[in-house]
């Protein structure tokens, strides 16, 4: 499946949309008085690209069977997920202000019983990749079955005696780099590589921070790419705030039919608000009302220049 060309005009529109999403994140967190700031702001560009350019999805028909699946593993960054969903039409933008409130559909960690448009509930770090691997494996089994009947727009091809996938539907999984400290991720990496799940594309938010500090001081991950390649994955490094480069990385990933792909997206935590950027202390706290007002002024000033 090839994506539409990403023109300069479309990139500008995505930049504006990402800014809108960042503003919503700040407003949500200030209203809630709790939550995570750095990760959602840092992932806003990636969520924007996916929801407004990459994903096959239909907000008017959320249960569409041919939709791509997007699994959010590090569920604590859900303000950016909720904002992307609202701005793309899944529910009213005004509902974002109910984040973390009693009875709200927008829980502090995403929960499918409250918000049925979600593909997974997330909370325990490290669980999302295993969920995504299970979905990708199930799709592979279905693909092989449907290919025999020639009644689907997905198919398998034989290459060197093994079966690889060409598919119109992908399983995407977003991960935090800090959560790679959890061991069950590595079981999932092994399983996906062994089973050549070419319909699985994972994106790790390599922002180098976690709640207690810098990732490389707490539990070093590097050389991350080499480690994942050893599990028979294809690995792509990309700057996580360059829409053109991100789009090209996804296209490259979709061409890898015989391997799962990990995109290491190097992002700036707190991106868009200078006082929040690259400061691990903003991993798990919200801005105050005054800090939020200052952040919104900065974001609105940037939007006026796009």
Which functions belong to the PLM regions below?
Residues 82-83, 111, 184-186, 212-216, ...:
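Short acidic, glycine/serine/threonine-rich loops at helix termini
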Residues 18-34, 205-207:
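N-terminal capping segment at the start of a domain
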Residues 243-306:
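Glycine/aspartate-rich loop-and-adjacent alpha/beta segment that forms the canonical ThDP
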Residues 216-249, 300-306:
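Conserved thiamine diphosphate
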Residues 25-28, 40-149, 167-194:
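Cofactor-binding active-site loop characterized by glycine-rich and histidine/acidic residues
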Residues 147-153, 160:
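Intrinsic-disorder-associated, low-complexity terminal segments enriched in Asp/Asn/His/Tyr and depleted
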Residues 158-166:
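Short Gly/Ser/Thr- and charged-rich N-terminal loops/segments
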Residues 182-207, 262-264:
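A short alpha/beta connector and helix-capping loop motif
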